[in-house]
């Protein structure tokens, strides 16, 4: 099951309608906000010191890198975005930003993000940022998204790298701690995305994007969500057992994980309106945010100074 980019007529571009808000929307601000937060937590957990100004530059570069990838993703996916209810109000589809402008904006933003990360922070963080942008655009968006049922699983590497970038920005290294942060997001991504696919199944079928519910069916998808949720529960406790976080983290993250498992199990009793899938999707966002807030607030190692 696959689809290629199809030429579409987005109508006449009215440049006078373009606003700063449209360019912010082009960068996928909801995704970018989570990227910024997880990247910052990665910096905070690194057992080294860094000047707050340098830390600020690193956060801005991570944000711009995420925005760059989001803009280029919207440029490439403009054909299927026009067919999906969830994405029909994106700037390119609405005709307020021209597709070529979106591509140029994404490329320029990405260049400056990587350049200033290398110039002001360190080369490792810059390389990881460049790799993340490349992976999200080339591996996930262009190659996997329309061709593989494992698009979200393999493509999730890019979304899981921001805390590793943040950690490297402070420490100039990759450690077990940053790998665990990576694993938490990497394992969280499939159940989160498949829950969305459950209640947007018709859209994905219409666009011929091989999301798991559209290819394997809803029951198989729900089983996979439960499996990944169990793995996530296990991995989410690891920060305590390697000494990253204290006992409070273990207790609260354990409770959050049990609730996550409850919502995953409730999918098997979902109604035709996908009420449980929507609840699980909403909770999964809260879960990841709160887990990283816990990682930030209950850490037992050095912080930015």
Curated annotation (Swiss-Prot):
Its EC number is 2.5.1.141. One of its GO terms (biological process) is heme O biosynthetic process. It holds the Pfam family UbiA. Keywords: Cell inner membrane, Cell membrane, Heme biosynthesis, Membrane, Transferase, Transmembrane, Transmembrane helix. CDD domains: PT_UbiA_Cox10. It is a multi-pass membrane protein. It catalyses: heme b + (2E,6E)-farnesyl diphosphate + H2O = Fe(II)-heme o + diphosphate. It is found in: Cell inner membrane. The keyword Transmembrane helix applies. GO terms for cellular component: plasma membrane. One of its GO terms (molecular function) is protoheme IX farnesyltransferase activity. The chain crosses the membrane at residues 31-51, 52-72, 96-118, 123-145, 151-171, 179-199, 225-245, 247-267, 281-301. Pathway: Porphyrin-containing compound metabolism; heme O biosynthesis; heme O from protoheme: step 1/1. Disulfide bonds: none annotated. Belongs to the UbiA prenyltransferase family. Protoheme IX farnesyltransferase subfamily. Carbon 2 of the heme B porphyrin ring is defined according to the Fischer nomenclature. Converts heme B (protoheme IX) to heme O by substitution of the vinyl group on carbon 2 of heme B porphyrin ring with a hydroxyethyl farnesyl side group. HAMAP family: CyoE_CtaB. This is Protoheme IX farnesyltransferase. The gene is ctaB.
